[in-house]
């Protein structure tokens, strides 16, 4: 959240140059405040686990957030009871006419399937298209990031011979950027996917900006030029044991998975897990919600043309 200061305070320029968010008294006095409305399209198999992970991050901000859970209307969940889905999830037709401050679309275990072969691909495209006029900012995670980059910008992904699984070191590509405020120069984030998009391909696109990347995992944080779409190719929401559970599941299914990199102590699955990413994940979602949802969204959600463009120094 911003620090409110007098309009002409000399410290303002210094703080802004250090990437500290300050707000003049004039702007603060004219700022309307209300709860943020966030929609979550949950594509992960274990709905309750993913709900908990995302709500934990959203709840770690000073903003009040009202959350709606969205499902694919014609898909039956194999790992979550129908009672849970009917009680807590809505169908797209129920929200089609609404506007939201934020939308989160999760990953999905579909990394080895071509997008057009996904049974609900047309519905995913419909929701992505709808979000561009009904949501202030969209956060795409893992598979959803690749799917949206493909659908919106025509970028192609490459299937990997072995799964990219582990906790990898990342670096910022910019020293000053609102989304990266508070980030260390290097930080860790989990990845779990069977595909990757070439870093060079993304950087060549004029409408996209790579904000963080990894030598091992490639582009990690990508932002659209209009600030509406944020693509995160990893899983900052994962809890401590999620990669372990996936490793055990894949082993039991006879997939002979590699041990997740840099996750178990000494890369030994018999040893303890070292969680290195929780603070980063919390900060990433907090920055997104503050700078690209709360600061940009109109007070009156019925008028999405009133979004405030965010300007930052590169």
Curated annotation (Swiss-Prot):
Its main location: cytoplasm. It comes from Shewanella denitrificans (strain OS217 / ATCC BAA-1090 / DSM 15013). It comes from the Bacteria. Pathway: Amino-acid biosynthesis; L-methionine biosynthesis via de novo pathway; O-succinyl-L-homoserine from L-homoserine: step 1/1. The record marks 111 as: Important for acyl-CoA specificity. GO terms for molecular function: homoserine O-acetyltransferase activity; homoserine O-succinyltransferase activity. Substrate binds at residues 163, 192, 249. It is found in: Cytoplasm. Belongs to the MetA family. PANTHER family: HOMOSERINE O-SUCCINYLTRANSFERASE (PTHR20919:SF0). One of its GO terms (cellular component) is cytoplasm. GO terms for biological process: L-methionine biosynthetic process from homoserine via O-succinyl-L-homoserine and cystathionine. The active site is at residues 142, 235, 237. It catalyses: L-homoserine + succinyl-CoA = O-succinyl-L-homoserine + CoA. The gene is metAS. Its EC number is 2.3.1.46. Transfers a succinyl group from succinyl-CoA to L-homoserine, forming succinyl-L-homoserine. This is Homoserine O-succinyltransferase.
């Amino acid at each position: 959240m911003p620090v409110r200061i007098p309009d002409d305070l000399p410290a303002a320029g210094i703080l802004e140059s250090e990437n500290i968010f300050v707000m003049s008294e004039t702007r603060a006095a004219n700022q309307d405040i209300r709860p943020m409305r966030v929609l979550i399209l949950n594509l992960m198999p274990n709905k309750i686990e993913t709900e908990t992970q995302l709500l934990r991050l959203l709840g770690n901000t000073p903003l009040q957030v009202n959350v709606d859970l969205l499902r694919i209307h014609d898909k039956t969940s194999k790992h979550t009871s129908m009672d849970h889905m009917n009680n807590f999830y809505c169908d797209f037709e129920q929200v089609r006419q609404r506007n939201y401050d934020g939308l989160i679309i999760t990953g999905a275990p579909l990394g080895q399937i071509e997008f057009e072969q996904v049974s609900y691909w047309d519905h995913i495209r419909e929701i992505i298209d709808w979000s561009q006029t009904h949501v202030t900012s969209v956060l795409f995670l893992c598979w959803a990031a690749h799917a949206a980059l493909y659908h919106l910008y025509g970028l192609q992904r490459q299937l990997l011979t072995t799964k990219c699984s582990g906790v990898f070191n990342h670096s910022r590509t910019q020293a000053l950027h609102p989304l990266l405020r508070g980030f260390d120069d290097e930080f860790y984030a989990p990845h779990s996917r069977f595909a990757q998009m070439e870093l060079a391909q993304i950087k060549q696109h004029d409408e996209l900006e790579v904000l963080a990347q990894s030598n091992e995992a490639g582009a990690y944080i990508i932002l659209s030029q209009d600030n509406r779409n944020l693509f995160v190719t990893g899983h900052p929401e994962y809890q401590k044991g999620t990669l372990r559970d996936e490793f055990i599941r894949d082993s039991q299914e006879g997939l002979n998975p590699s041990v997740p990199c840099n996750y178990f102590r000494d890369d030994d699955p018999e040893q303890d897990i070292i969680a290195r990413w929780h603070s980063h994940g919390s900060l990433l979602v907090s920055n997104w919600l503050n700078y690209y949802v709360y600061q940009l969204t109109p007070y009156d959600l019925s008028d999405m043309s009133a979004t405030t463009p965010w300007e930052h120094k590169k």
